[in-house]
Amino acid sequence: MARQMTSSQFHKSKTLDNKYMLGDEIGKGAYGRVYKGLDLENGDFVAIKQVSLENIVQEDLNTIMQEIDLLKNLNHKNIVKYLGSSKTKTHLHIILEYVENGSLANIIKPNKFGPFPESLVAVYIAQVLEGLVYLHEQGVIHRDIKGANILTTKEGLVKLADFGVATKLNEADVNTHSVVGTPYWMAPEVIEMSGVCAASDIWSVGCTVIELLTCVPPYYDLQPMPALFRIVQDDNPPIPDSLSPDITDFLRQCFKKDSRQRPDAKTLLSHPWIRNSRRALQSSLRHSGTIKYMKEATASSEKDDEGSQDAAESLSGENVGISKTDSKSKLPLVGVSSFRSEKDQSTPSDLGEEGTDNSEDDIMSDQVPTLSIHEKSSDAKGTPQDVSDFHGKSERGETPENLVTETSEARKNTSAIKHVGKELSIPVDQTSHSFGRKGEERGIRKAVKTPSSVSGNELARFSDPPGDASLHDLFHPLDKVSEGKPNEASTSMPTSNVNQGDSPVADGGKNDLATKLRATIAQKQMEGETGHSNDGGDLFRLMMGVLKDDVIDIDGLVFDEKVPAENLFPLQAVEFSRLVSSLRPDESEDAIVSSCQKLVAMFRQRPEQKVVFVTQHGFLPLMDLLDIPKSRVICAVLQLINEIIKDNTDFQENACLVGLIPVVMSFAGPERDRSREIRKEAAYFLQQLCQSSPLTLQMFIACRGIPVLVGFLEADYAKYREMVHLAIDGMWQVFKLKRSTPRNDFCRIAAKNGILLRLINTLYSLNEATRLASISGGLDGQAPRVRSGQLDPNNPIFGQNETSSLSMIDQPDVLKTRHGGGEEPSHASTSNSQRSDVHQPDALHPDGDKPRVSSVAPDASTSGTEDVRQQHRISLSANRTSTDKLQKLAEGASNGFPVTQTEQVRPLLSLLDKEPPSRHYSGQLDYVKHITGIERHESRLPLLHGSNEKKNNGDLDFLMAEFAEVSGRGKENGSLDTTTRYPSKTMTKKVLAIEGVASTSGIASQTASGVLSGSGVLNARPGSATSSGLLAHMVSTLSADVAREYLEKVADLLLEFARADTTVKSYMCSQSLLSRLFQMFNRVEPPILLKILECTNHLSTDPNCLENLQRADAIKHLIPNLELKDGHLVYQIHHEVLSALFNLCKINKRRQEQAAENGIIPHLMLFIMSDSPLKQYALPLLCDMAHASRNSREQLRAHGGLDVYLSLLDDEYWSVIALDSIAVCLAQDNDNRKVEQALLKQDAIQKLVDFFQSCPERHFVHILEPFLKIITKSYRINKTLAVNGLTPLLISRLDHQDAIARLNLLKLIKAVYEHHPRPKQLIVENDLPQKLQNLIEERRDGQRSGGQVLVKQMATSLLKALHINTIL
């Protein structure tokens, strides 16, 4: 039975020319299958490669068979021998030597032997190089070196297979769309078709080394097209880290990007890696290889262990630092960040210097009502020596061993320590009038931070002495001046400050109520009842007793101008305690809301009360109130929290540490049941964290803050304007955070949460807002935009816009309400109806923004300043109200208080004339403060470095305004900083910024969103030029500027994401996102267009994005931008477009054809012919068009592309590529033969002949193949070239020593000879037979492998043909 089956199988098997029997299939390649064969004559096994003739024309088939017959003459132990070829009607069969063990690629498969050790790879690669040396000597370039084409015998002998013919098959295939070779092993010049040479095989050898070591070649994790892109784009393929130095150097030699710098195969055979492995092989291949491999692994492991240990030590060091910080942050006092940054670790001298700029915060001893009772005796008893001792230890960073952390003791000592902080900041010259407001907040912050390094004994030194409860000093704050005590004069900031003003406030002490209180207290002191009491309870009872006699309403008294300043503090303390006690969940909703609102007003009047609140109560009670499911309560509590943390980094850190961030974040989401008011309060809280300090920003990010910022990028820009601004500025702050976390990680988090589509939608909205605002403001789109520098004082900045076309940006700001006690009026408009930009993200200018020059206008004139101040003094008494009235009015009236139109307009004009602000792009938050009306006592603009800026000390100026001559000091300080503040007026209090430069971002944002909201007050004056004319125009201009500023920021954000890694870029490559982005190309102005094009260009550098860009019609949208001709950004725009198109079209013929269809060819030719610097992109693109498709070649011819190619023959660098493009165009010419006709012109023929004659030696080898294509594809061109001087040039170069050049020259001479009109004349005139004979007889001495075998064979066959023609 078995014999019958065998017989049956034998009869079914195929035979080839009755000489070979086809057996099993043993492989499959790009152009056919490989079968095992049996030679029926001698029984030898052979390999038979079967190639389909479906797409190969007869002419090319003959060439291929001639090539095989030529290759039969090659004979070397390290190459597979060609035995012949056979042709049937449907297939070409190539007969090859059979190598029994198969390919190395098959052996290293994971299910077989796996990757080889370096030593074994060296053994195999040495033999590969031997084979290549032979092939290259014979003039053959393999072009497809890889593991699958390296075959082995049982004895370990390596043979190179599949050389020479693959190229011919690829060129003959009329449907091919790829370059020759296998993608992952291809050299860059092969991919770019810029001239294949022997060095191309060396690159492939390097790829094969990595393949044998890792089982896969470089870039194998990519698809073929992206892999080709990376091969051309990268400096060199990735080399595994674990390799030895020798093999790494070997690979670097192979991967030289410039083929001329790569060593040849013969040189690489002497490389140390190959030599050392050969010596090791002689002793013991297997043992030596194993030991070496183990040593490498051990060394690598030890290195990794050392790295891990170093990292662990570094990490542990960081942890120690963190733990120390944490331990100090547990102090009960507010200064939890005293040791967290270097700027806080000030020396006494530093503090003294800061003290010279101390503020008016310290007027009236900077009284905190509940602490003022304990303060005065410390004033008398603290000595300079105490101060020096205190700070000496503080500077050394000593910490108490037994620190008492009870809140009561902290309270008890706060005032004393606070006072010491003030003592240290007293200037030496007490008579100087230089007390400015350069650092108003420092007094409070330094005082609060100081105790964190004070020992227990030092704290005891500042404990409350007997008699500390005396109110004598409290009610006589100025009496000490007359006493003239030097010690007290030098340590009392309020005394010196008030004394400078020569204020008559002491007359207020003659008030009857104060007289009665002092008399009562004096009586009690004489009776000894209160002399030793440190408890304020008896004191308050005394006060209340006196007050009952006069039946005074506390609520009405708080802001009653008739009550002297010294009488307000104890009354506010009582009110403060009552309000705080009502902040409990069991209180009614109305009570909680009312208490929160009154506390907000109180904190604005006296910001130092915040210290008391945070120290005694903290944020936890407020967090409990946030659990109440009532919107009014939540909103009111959030307002209170925001007022407390405003511009105070310590309080913000405190709030973060107790877990307030996640709680507030829960109110920031876009849930439908969440009121907009609550959301904007939460947004302001988060904005403060982002913009105050790096530490709070880190805590915000750690609590998953980035997704919250993404959520603020609402689609409805008109409705959520400021929230969108907050998100944009917040993202920039995140990106600017200088920490070990890579920016790419932040990009990935944001991209994962959907920021990219939101950014593009925001970009669209902002662009529309810019366009509409520009149109409405009368801008024609060509007028220059003032982005920084002085504002024109002749043009009013703020006003009411009467047109309705700005509806998109005329909405009230989301974050601009209720933080001044309700809907706040704009600081800059002349109407109290507009809301001010309280939560001002506009002040953020990230470093990523391009810097703009900023300037500040000269300070205001003295007379103008006095006018403003006098105006506000007049209105003081008429507009004061109680806390309750303040809150009710703030909540109930959106148009503010009725004031005369003259009063409204004058402050605005003063601002315009005196201090036109300018933008400051320093990367820091500029600080702009404005006072606008009864609804706001202090503007709330965020500050990144609060300690560098001035703050207002509540309403102490408000109480002392009529007496302190601050205007004089204001003039001396050269600013309006000390202008007194009156809450009913619409005036600008301050325009401050770091180094004197203020940001208009806040002003412009407030104007754009607040002023445009429209109460009609400004427009009520039809005859005023400032009401609806210039003001409306300037509002529109500034609105456009604000939108344009954020438009640029969004474009820069997109650019940041486009620069990120592949994962982030993949989020950008969704179809809808890219389509919307590309649609904006013709909508945006050139600066924004340039940024969007940069994004596209960055995406095009990632091979994984190319397919997505193609599907989104990137090429179709990019090319029209090349039509731009005018403008200073045209070159940059063209650069980005061409670079992106170059990346898209490189290698890929489909995209090249798409670019040609969309009209790129005329643009490319223009760049080339005008010798533009951008021709570096245009030239390769234009040359690639010849390879793309018939349609692209037709367009090339129609636009004169062939003439450009011919002109490029004079360009040394591009000549070879241009010649190859000409050859391709001719080879693919259609039946009309238009390319042939163009090349037959006399000037074209002459250019070709001249180029061959003058071609540089280094390019000579590369031009022979294109010339061979040209003369073999067109016999007419062949004859014309031959009779116009090409023939003698060909024959004269036969003495070239390179075998590849000689072989191609012989092929050219043979082709010319076969079509020459006068062959005998050619033979005789050029003495061709003798030159051929010299080639045949060459090599007598010492050349190995029999010399240039193929050259001799070719010369011999040509000589025989000449002999026949001579005889005939």
Curated annotation (Swiss-Prot):
Keywords: ATP-binding, Cell cycle, Cell division, Cell membrane, Cytoplasm, Cytoskeleton, Kinase, Membrane, Nucleotide-binding, Nucleus, Phosphoprotein, Repeat, Serine/threonine-protein kinase, Transferase. The keyword Aminoacyl-tRNA synthetase does not apply. Gene3D superfamilies: Leucine-rich Repeat Variant, Transferase(Phosphotransferase) domain 1. Residues 488-502, 791-808 have a biased composition (Polar residues). It is found in: Cytoplasm, Cytoskeleton, Microtubule organizing center; Nucleus, Nucleolus; Cell membrane. Induction: Expression is cell cycle-regulated, with higher expression in G2-M phases. One of its GO terms (biological process) is protein autophosphorylation. Residues 388-399, 470-486, 813-826, 836-852 have a biased composition (Basic and acidic residues). Residues 351-364 have a biased composition (Acidic residues). Its EC number is 2.7.11.1. GO terms for molecular function: ATP binding; protein serine kinase activity; protein serine/threonine kinase activity. HEAT repeats lie at residues 25-62, 86-125, 218-256, 533-571, 628-653, 654-695, 699-737, 750-788, 903-940, 1025-1063, 1067-1105, 1112-1150, 1154-1191, 1196-1234, 1258-1281, 1282-1318, 1348-1368. One of its GO terms (cellular component) is cytosol. Residues 296-415, 430-507, 777-883 are annotated as: Disordered. PROSITE patterns: PROTEIN_KINASE_ATP (PS00107), PROTEIN_KINASE_DOM (PS50011), PROTEIN_KINASE_ST (PS00108). The active site is at D144. Autophosphorylated. Disruption phenotype: Pollen lethality in plants lacking both MAP3KE1 and MAP3KE2, associated with plasma membrane irregularities following pollen mitosis I. Smaller plants with shorter roots due to reduced cell elongation in roots and reduced cell expansion in rosette leaves, as well as embryos arrest in the early stages of development. Interacts with SGP1. Belongs to the protein kinase superfamily. Ser/Thr protein kinase family. Serine/threonine-protein kinase involved in the spatial and temporal control system organizing cortical activities in mitotic and postmitotic cells. Required for the normal functioning of the plasma membrane in developing pollen. Involved in the regulation of cell expansion, cell elongation, and embryo development. This is MAP3K epsilon protein kinase 1. It comes from Arabidopsis thaliana (Mouse-ear cress). The lineage of its organism: Eukaryota, Viridiplantae, Streptophyta, Embryophyta, Tracheophyta. The gene is M3KE1.
